[in-house]
Amino acid sequence: MLKRFLKRPVLGQIAWLLLFSFYIAVCLNIAFYKQVLQDLPLNSLRNVLVFISMPVVAFSVVNSVLTLASFIWLNRLLACVFILVGAAAQYFILTYGIIIDRSMIANMMDTTPAETFALMTPQMVLTLGLSGVLAAVIAFWVKIRPATPRLRSGLYRLASVLISILLVILVAAFFYKDYASLFRNNKQLIKALSPSNSIVASWSWYSHQRLANLPLVRIGEDAHRNPLMLKGDRKNLTILIVGETSRGDDFSLGGYPRDTNPRLAKDDVIYFPHTTSCGTATAISVPCMFSDMPRKHYDEELAHHQEGLLDIIQRAGINVLWNDNDGGCKGACDRVPHQNVTELNLPGQCIDGECYDEVLFHGLEDYIDHLKGDGVIVLHTIGSHGPTYYNRYPPQFKKFTPTCDTNEIQNCSQEQLINTYDNTVLYVDYIVDKAINLLKSHQDKFTTSLVYLSDHGESLGENGVYLHGLPYSIAPDTQKHVPMLIWLSKDYQQRYQVDQACLQKRASTLDYSQDNLFSTMLGLTGVQTTYYQAADDILQPCRRLSE
């Protein structure tokens, strides 16, 4: 009985190719067809026919590729790759509403083991195990009947390819205008079609990565300090906090009805409620905000082999330190002193390879005590990174309940998810306030200042979208609206003649973005270079300091 059950089923080669082409093109593209139905109402016979033609085209293309691969005995291997890739893509699209593009591949490649583990759920294991791994095993397990004679088999397969091509041509002849209009007006659709989405996105990512060995482009070689910043007994110390996945919409400083910023509300900070990000993923936003390029002209390839903000600040003679708790600086700190404090795995601060952001302060007191000269300290936080929002804050910050204490966020209610996320913001409030108090405790030696800016926002199930990383052109504002604030000590305001009331007024009425960080940090630290743009320096209109 067992022997009979384990006996390998046998299919002819054409039947095998047709079966697995259908599975890949139709069964692993449910996410694609669901998205098509959102943009193509079936309110006419023509639209119904256009929709029906889509799986026909997908099947024809996959069948052509697998059949041609069969001539060089690669059909099984290629089918398995398509199945595994398609199953994974479909799961994440259906579960989190993501889009498979280059930035998503970059996110995946930058994902830490801890982040990968956080995504692992019973639903994910079961879904990928059945639709991906099991299907791939079956593709190898099914025995293909040897073709006799081979010439006839070859002719049959060529005929299959020709018929598939003919079907594509016929669909194009009848529905080209419909396809062109649909995909032109809904460019994100093609990024839901497997396995082409993963193939194109991976190739695009590789094309960018291979440029990493290009020679370094130096900028700001004329960098020097404003002489007025060097006068006086006190040195200058600035902390720049790079936030992670914090939404401007959830900061009470910006009008959010919940009190998510109780500490910062007492710190006399300048909050900028109308701030947008450069990208919707850390891999894009962090290199962009530390570059001299505005978002509209940002060149990701150039940014990977060009100096940035911290290189210029360091060249001007300021001590720079980057403390990281978010999986790396994406190139922004490559040429300045930096350390991954997550790897310290401090007791009480770290769980399963991830740490609370308070770990970023480990050793900072000692570093500041021994700091000779001016300094800039960058704290790269893990902030509100999902989907394990409940792991971002210690138990005492669980203020808003009930919470979503699972990584299967799609199974939580909207109330639970927002409560959990808002608790992460409450902890962000604590971290930024702690940094301000750290600076205050060293005001006997330093004139101090602080900037906080999140890298991007987050979707919390609005319109069925979760997490972040959607293409900028179609991403919701929740992924692009980010919190930014500046704190200036009284000493800084007086010493460098900055009118805080002026800043508060401008902050509440004007629009800002991550484009402002580069020149604002140069101005804040008194670094002069031809790359500095006064129009982008937030403090400049309210500053009376001059040579």
UniProtKB/Swiss-Prot annotation:
Organism superkingdom: Bacteria
Membrane topology: Multi-pass membrane protein
Ranges of the Cytoplasmic topological domain: 1-9, 69-79, 145-154
Induction notes from the record: The eptA-basRS operon is positively autoregulated by BasR under high iron or aluminum concentration conditions.
Functional description taken from the UniProt entry: Catalyzes the addition of a phosphoethanolamine moiety to the lipid A. The phosphoethanolamine modification is required for resistance to polymyxin.
Family to which this protein belongs: Belongs to the phosphoethanolamine transferase family. EptA subfamily.
Protein's name in the database: Phosphoethanolamine transferase EptA
Gene, per the UniProt record: eptA
